[in-house]
Amino acid sequence: MNLPSLEDYFIKTGFYDVLPLALKLAENLGFDHHEIIEAICKVNDKFNQYPPTKNRTAWFRMVFEEKLKESRADILAFKAKKDPL
C-alpha cells in the first residue's frame, strides 16, 4: 500500500511553500511524522474557516504550532482509548 508522503499532504492543502518552516518547527518542538500530518490537516480546516488577513507565514507558524499540540493530544487520546490499561 502506497501511503501519501508528507509533501503530498502539504501540496494538497496548499501549504507546500511553508513546508521547510513546518519541518523545522516540528523538529525543534519534538513532533513526529504522524503528528505533522494530523496538524497540517487541522491547519487546513482552520484556514478554510478563518483565513489569514495579512501575514500568511506568521499566521501559519502560530496555527501550526497550536495544531501540532492538538494533534499530539488527539493521537495520545486515541492510543489510550485503543489500549486501555
Model-derived regions, located:
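Append "and, occasionally, other polyanion-binding protein interfaces
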Residues: M1-K69, L76-L85
